[in-house]
C-alpha cells in the first residue's frame, strides 16, 4: 500500500539516477506526478517520458539524463506566499541559483522561479538540484 505516490515516484527517480540507469518506470501514475515530471523536463533535469495505460493505474517510463544530484518531496506540504520563497530556498537548496523548488499554484505546477515571476504563491511539493 503506497500512501504518497509523489514521494514514491521521486525516490524511484533518485535511486535510478544513483545507479546510473538511463530509464526508470514509475507506477502508479497520477496527474500530479505527470505535472511534476513535465516541470522537471522543461527545466532540463529529465528527458522525455511516456504514459502507458496498463489498466491497473498506469505506468510512466522516464528517460534520465544523469543531471539530478538530489531530488525529494517536501513533507508536510507547506503553504508559501509569493514573497517567502527565499527562506525556503535556503532551507532546501544547497546554494543560491542552484536547483529548483516545485510549487503547486492556482495556475498549475511550476518552479519557484516561474511562480515568483508571475507573483503567485502556492504549496511546496518537491526540491531538485
Curated annotation (Swiss-Prot):
Listed Gene3D superfamilies = 3.30.1370.30, 3.30.1490.10
Q: Name one GO cellular component term.
A: ribosome
Q: Which domain of life is it from?
A: Archaea
Keywords per UniProt:
Ribonucleoprotein, Ribosomal protein, RNA-binding, rRNA-binding
Q: Which family does it belong to?
A: Belongs to the universal ribosomal protein uS8 family.
Subunit description: Part of the 30S ribosomal subunit.
Q: Indicate what this protein is called per its UniProt record.
A: Small ribosomal subunit protein uS8
Task: Point out the gene that encodes the protein.
Answer: rps8
Amino acid at each position: 500500500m503506497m500512501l504518497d505516490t509523489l514521494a514514491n515516484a521521486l525516490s524511484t527517480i533518485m535511486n535510478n539516477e544513483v545507479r546510473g540507469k538511463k530509464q526508470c518506470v514509475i507506477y502508479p501514475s497520477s496527474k500530479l506526478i505527470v505535472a511534476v515530471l513535465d516541470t522537471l523536463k522543461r527545466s532540463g533535469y529529465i528527458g522525455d517520458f511516456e504514459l502507458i495505460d496498463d489498466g491497473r493505474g498506469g505506468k510512466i517510463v522516464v528517460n534520465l539524463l544523469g543531471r539530478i544530484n538530489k531530488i525529494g518531496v517536501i513533507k508536510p506540504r507547506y503553504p508559501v506566499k509569493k514573497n517567502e520563497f527565499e527562506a525556503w530556498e535556503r532551507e532546501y537548496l544547497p546554494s543560491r541559483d542552484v536547483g529548483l523548488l516545485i510549487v503547486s499554484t492556482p495556475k498549475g505546477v511550476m518552479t519557484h522561479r516561474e511562480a515568483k515571476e508571475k507573483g503567485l504563491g502556492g504549496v511546496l511539493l518537491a526540491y531538485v538540484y
